[in-house]
């Protein structure tokens, strides 16, 4: 059985998908862009602003599921440029404590809405 998780504190999905799905002991959070829910626009045009907002969106969705960032066991980060890797790592690291989630990071040709970063997460209940 699966349950749709939706937070009004994170942006609506921009396509035919849910913000998150909970099933059994796992919560799968869809990729989050750095979109500010109050404006529907990117929080900023820079990697720092977009990464921070992406993480805040994940945090809000997890909170709706009754979880915190300490429940995250795996993330995937998609970057427009791996040149932003160090900046993203600094921000990302501030949201977690050891043991850190497993993670994969990829550079991609293009992201939705020409975003600089997209982050998805898997959490355990």
Swiss-Prot record:
CDD domains: YjgF_YER057c_UK114_family. InterPro entries: RidA, RidA_CS, RutC-like_sf, YjgF/YER057c/UK114. One of its GO terms (molecular function) is deaminase activity. GO terms for cellular component: cytosol. PANTHER family: 2-IMINOBUTANOATE/2-IMINOPROPANOATE DEAMINASE RIDA, 2-IMINOBUTANOATE_2-IMINOPROPANOATE DEAMINASE. Belongs to the RutC family. This is RutC family protein HP_0944. It comes from Helicobacter pylori (strain ATCC 700392 / 26695) (Campylobacter pylori). The lineage of its organism: Bacteria, Pseudomonadati, Campylobacterota, Epsilonproteobacteria, Campylobacterales.
């Amino acid at each position: 059985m699966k349950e749709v998780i939706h937070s009004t504190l994170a942006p609506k999905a921009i396509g035919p998908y849910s913000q998150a799905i909970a099933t059994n002991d796992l919560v799968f959070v869809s990729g989050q862009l750095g979109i500010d829910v109050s404006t529907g626009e990117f929080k900023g045009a820079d990697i720092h602003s977009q990464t921070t907002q992406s993480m805040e969106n994940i945090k809000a969705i997890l909170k709706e599921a009754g979880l915190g960032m300490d429940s995250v066991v795996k993330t995937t980060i998609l970057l427009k440029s791996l040149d932003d890797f160090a900046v993203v790592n600094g921000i990302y690291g501030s949201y977690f404590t050891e043991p850190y989630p497993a993670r994969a990071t990829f550079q991609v040709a293009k992201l939705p809405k020409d975003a600089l970063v997209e982050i998805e997460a898997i959490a355990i209940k």
